[in-house]
Amino acid sequence: ACGIEIALETNLCPSDFEYLLENCPPDIGVNYDSGNSASLGYDVKQEWDTYGAKIINVHIKDRLLHGPSVPMGEGDADFDTLAKMLSKFDYGGNLILQVARGESGKEVEWYHKNRNFLLDRGIG
């Protein structure tokens, strides 16, 4: 009633996360993280088809499979499918850049590089 939304972000596979959500109050949402998904080897389409209607927040980053965050476009995140899912589910929530840091002192340059990377894929 006070305008606060609660979202869960986990490393559970889609079916286990779906089970968790089914056992939570219906107003609990999902914070989706593209990098964590890539790191765990999950299928973006399967995740969104499983609980996309409950996604209220999206963290955007790139990660290697079973590895760390890397600059956008250098990891295993499936941004093309993510763009399709954002459109399919008419997502209108936050897109939060949680990207790997570039060279110190060049934050503005890195911001524009990351933003353009996403815009080129229809995200944002």
What is the role of each PLM region?
Residues E5-L12:
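Catalytic beta/alpha-barrel core
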Residues P14-Y32, N36-G124:
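Histidine-acidic metal/acid-base catalytic patches
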